[in-house]
């Protein structure tokens, strides 16, 4: 017996040289007892989770050390304390009733051996399909090992993605096409080939939609039995902190490690949360080593994350990083049209183009804000019984648009555009910005408006505020130059020369 204890001590000593103190203590400090049965060492650990972890992550190394250090053939086996205990039906029923009180959705319960199968079958506590499963798989009056039994609860809230997010209702454009295609590819693949997927971009441009669409697609179309978990980073921090305080880390680990797809939104929120980052690092490595898919979103690329451990950011960078840019004007129009169809599926709601142009040009960098503005307008018109036109749109969205005007733009670039255009047409900046209606002033003014829109994608109403013109006048000026530049060679040449000077 002592010899076998010494053998295990030698193996432990070698493992401590290979793995960090943190990993070693977490996994191998939970050894309960060691016993010998002939040429076999049986090592008891506290939980089934720890046993499985050792087999998945460390057992090959243990066998390798065993072979190198000892000549005689020694078999090492791990068992968990809670799996060794046989429990009778009454105990199991009490356990089941306790779980029922605690949980509201679906969960998994691990049953011990049931000694009397007839008692099991005759008890109304179990459903018919469970009885049928026993009858089909086993004879009466034998021990039955039942694992991973599904009952009508879900302890860990797997499959918690919002069903409204799908690939079908995601509006694809140049700014998000690559991120969309990669996300769909990952959702459709049976094997993990891209891990992790790291999607970054400004707030409100579709990152959350995409990662939840991945989860929903997997749940609905491909692998419905897979466990999918969506969590925002702040929710992960709160949950980890609470479970740590309550000494329930085993539940926490069981929840997050027994999944097939982890979706983490806004990872940048973990900045400065050192303990949480350490826990997430361990979780990340566990899922990665076990070929479980990880998808992460952030408002910036991994190399720009502040106060996030470098060993985490390096793992993010080792995967596939894809960005989503702000949508261009036409893309924003398409998003608005899609949103209108969601609001009125019968397509009876007609909104004029100038109204959509106003919204699309006023909310440039945040799709969520733009959609919110549209919904405000639709509800405003519906509540008061108005037909939607440009006047009603301005009335309904006045405060929202005014707040957007406070956004700062690169004044140096705007000033340079005005100066270059004025010099090119040999007029003063003052005349360019004036309300003079002569052709020698209006044409250069229209050119300046067009270039500001093209180069900076600033909303029409804000461009109008620069020139003291309304939205409609600015829109017409832009469209006129854009249309004429396609057929007027001289105009096209002038625009190219002006652009060259601006960029020099």
From Swiss-Prot:
Spell out the residue ranges making up region: Domain III, AAA+ region: 160-381
| Localization, UniProt | Cytoplasm
The record's SUPFAM superfamilies line, in alphabetical order, gives: P-loop containing nucleoside triphosphate hydrolases (SSF52540), TrpR-like (SSF48295)
Q: What biological-process GO terms show up in the record?
A: DNA replication initiation; regulation of DNA replication
Q: Where is this region: Domain I, interacts with DnaA modulators?
A: 1-80
Q: Which residues bind ATP?
A: 204, 206-208
Q: Name one GO cellular component term.
A: cytoplasm
Q: Where is this region: Domain IV, binds dsDNA?
A: 382-504
Gene3D superfamilies for the chain: 1.10.1750.10, 1.10.8.60, 3.30.300.180, P-loop containing nucleotide triphosphate hydrolases
Query: Any transmembrane segments, and where?
Result: none
Keywords in alphabetical order: ATP-binding, Cytoplasm, DNA replication, DNA-binding, Lipid-binding, Nucleotide-binding
| InterPro entries in the cross-refs | AAA+_ATPase, Chromosome_initiator_DnaA, Chromosome_initiator_DnaA-like, DnaA_C, DnaA_dom, DnaA_N_dom, DnaA_N_sf, P-loop_NTPase
Q: Could you give a GO molecular-function term held by this entry?
A: DNA replication origin binding
Name of one Pfam family that matches = DnaA_N
- Does DNA-binding appear among the keywords? yes
Extract the ranges annotated as region (Domain II). Answer: 80-159
Q: What is known of its domains?
A: Domain I is involved in oligomerization and binding regulators, domain II is flexibile and of varying length in different bacteria, domain III forms the AAA+ region, while domain IV binds dsDNA.
Q: How does it assemble?
A: Oligomerizes as a right-handed, spiral filament on DNA at oriC.
Q: Which family does it belong to?
A: Belongs to the DnaA family.
UniProt-listed HAMAP family: DnaA_bact
Per the entry, what this protein does is: Plays an essential role in the initiation and regulation of chromosomal replication. ATP-DnaA binds to the origin of replication (oriC) to initiate formation of the DNA replication initiation complex once per cell cycle. Binds the DnaA box (a 9 base pair repeat at the origin) and separates the double-stranded (ds)DNA. Forms a right-handed helical filament on oriC DNA; dsDNA binds to the exterior of the filament while single-stranded (ss)DNA is stabiized in the filament's interior.
PANTHER family in the cross-refs: CHROMOSOMAL REPLICATION INITIATOR PROTEIN DNAA
Name the record gives this protein: Chromosomal replication initiator protein DnaA
In its UniProt entry, the species of origin is given as Aster yellows witches'-broom phytoplasma (strain AYWB)
């Amino acid at each position: 017996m002592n010899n076998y204890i010494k053998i295990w001590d030698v193996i432990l000593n070698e493992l401590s040289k290979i793995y960090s103190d943190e990993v070693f203590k977490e996994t191998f400090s939970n050894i309960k007892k060691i016993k010998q049965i002939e040429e076999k060492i049986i090592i008891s650990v506290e939980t089934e989770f720890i046993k499985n972890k050792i087999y998945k992550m460390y057992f090959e190394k243990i066998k390798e050390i065993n072979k190198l250090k000892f000549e005689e053939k020694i078999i090492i086996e791990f068992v968990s304390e809670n799996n060794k205990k046989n429990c009778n039906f009454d105990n199991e029923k009490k356990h089941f009733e306790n779980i029922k009180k605690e949980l509201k959705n679906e969960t998994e319960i691990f049953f011990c051996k049931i000694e009397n199968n007839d008692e099991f079958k005759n008890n109304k506590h179990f459903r018919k399909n469970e009885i049928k499963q026993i009858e089909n798989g086993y004879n009466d009056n034998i021990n039955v090992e039942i694992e991973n039994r599904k009952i009508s609860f879900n302890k860990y809230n797997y499959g918690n993605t919002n069903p409204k997010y799908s690939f079908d209702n995601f509006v694809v454009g140049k700014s998000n096409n690559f991120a969309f295609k990669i996300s769909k590819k990952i959702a459709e693949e049976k094997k993990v080939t891209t891990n992790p997927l790291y999607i970054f971009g400004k707030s409100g441009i579709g990152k959350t939609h995409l990662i939840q669409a991945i989860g929903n697609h997997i749940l609905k179309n491909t692998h419905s039995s897979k466990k999918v978990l969506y969590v925002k980073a702040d929710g992960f921090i709160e949950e980890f902190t609470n479970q740590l305080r309550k000494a329930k880390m085993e539940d926490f680990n069981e929840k997050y490690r027994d999944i097939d797809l982890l979706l983490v939104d806004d990872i940048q929120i973990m900045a400065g949360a050192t303990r949480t980052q350490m826990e997430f690092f361990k979780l990340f490595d566990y899922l990665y080593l076990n070929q479980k898919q990880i998808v992460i979103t952030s408002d910036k690329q991994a190399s720009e994350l502040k106060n996030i451990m470098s060993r985490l950011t390096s793992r993010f960078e080792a995967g596939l990083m894809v960005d989503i840019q702000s949508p261009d004007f036409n893309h924003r129009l398409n998003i608005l049209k899609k949103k209108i169809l969601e609001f009125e599926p019968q397509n009876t709601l007609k909104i004029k183009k100038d109204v959509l142009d106003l919204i699309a040009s006023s909310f440039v960098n945040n799709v969520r804000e733009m959609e919110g503005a549209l919904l405000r307008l639709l509800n405003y018109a519906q509540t008061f019984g108005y037909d939607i036109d440009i006047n009603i749109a301005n009335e309904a969205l006045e405060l929202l648009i005014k707040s957007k005007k406070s956004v700062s733009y690169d004044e140096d670039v705007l000033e340079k555009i005005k100066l270059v255009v004025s010099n090119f047409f040999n007029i003063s900046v003052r005349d360019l910005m004036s309300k003079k209606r002569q052709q020698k002033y209006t044409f250069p003014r229209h050119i300046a408006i067009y270039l500001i829109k093209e180069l900076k994608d600033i909303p029409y109403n804000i461009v109008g505020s620069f020139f003291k013109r309304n939205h409609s006048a600015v829109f017409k000026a832009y469209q006129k130059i854009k249309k004429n530049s396609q057929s007027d060679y001289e105009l096209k040449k002038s625009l190219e020369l002006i652009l060259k000077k601006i960029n020099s």
